[in-house]
Amino acid sequence: MDSPSNATVPCGFLLQGFSEFPHLRPVLFLLLLGVHLATLGGNLLILVAVASMPSRQPMLLFLCQLSAIELCYTLVVVPRSLVDLSTPGHRRGSPISFLSCAFQMQMFVALGGAECFLLAAMAYDRYVAICHPLRYAAVVTPGLCARLALACCLRGLAVSVGLTVAIFHLPFCGSRLLLHFFCDITALLHLACTRSYADELPLLGACLVLLLLPSVLILASYGAIAAALRRLRCPKGRGKAASTCALHLAVTFLHYGCATFMYVRPRASYSPRLDRTLALVYTNVTPLLCPLIYSLRNREITAALSRVLGRRRPGQAPGGDLREL
């Protein structure tokens, strides 16, 4: 008799998920559900708060896009994982069709790539705001923000389509059991019949475009910011700006660090359990923390959130300094 991984899904795959840990399924379900609801609520609240502002600074377009990306990002992966964890019949793996798997991978890469470019654009915004404050309004215009936001999405989409086509043109034979809880690139590469380094070239190219180039821009922007802060004579202002940038960098490194460790390594070092652990952080913790930290360090956003929640303090002035973002 054929094994389930070979015979039950002839035109698709089986997502193993966390089926080898049946005793942890209820705990994982409750934990993921709580984080997922917090992520949805936090990002939706940011979108509503920005939409409620009578006048919005151009940079807030980036924040709205970041929240929207994280919202979609978590919806691509987490709901299906929750269903799989709550379904007793999926103890050996959850079936997913070939096209559904390709679509999930493409959307995951597109949204993740758009976020990588967006974080670089936001780093450039902070560079202009801190290093050239008098020219900020002339440089960072609503038109520039809109063009950068659109470019981030289009570049992420272009890379994701090319990578998805390359991965799903590989021959898959033998077991169709994906050792992951979603259709991840490394898990799919592990199932490919061939073991040529050429199979990994599309992933390497995508990593160069999505990870290396934006990270260089981010490091250059923050390097210039650090140099400018050292020349700042006001200790209070320098400390406040430095703490804000440190938080932004921490979230950025969490995003890039997980992605780099997961994808910038040879196929021979593939570790399913480690990849799934990192993916849990990458798909659940980062979408929760990233928009909140970027938003709550800005007075304009916190004032809008207070208005939405009905907790605005008497005498609290709306608006704030963009350099706090």
Swiss-Prot record:
PROSITE patterns linked: G_PROTEIN_RECEP_F1_1 (PS00237), G_PROTEIN_RECEP_F1_2 (PS50262)
Subcellular location: Cell membrane
Sites carrying sugar chains: N6
GO molecular function: G protein-coupled receptor activity; olfactory receptor activity
UniProt keyword list: Cell membrane, G-protein coupled receptor, Glycoprotein, Membrane, Olfaction, Receptor, Sensory transduction, Transducer, Transmembrane, Transmembrane helix
Membrane topology note: Multi-pass membrane protein
Function: Odorant receptor.
Family per record: Belongs to the G-protein coupled receptor 1 family.
Protein name per its UniProtKB record: Olfactory receptor 10AC1
Source organism of this protein record: Homo sapiens (Human)
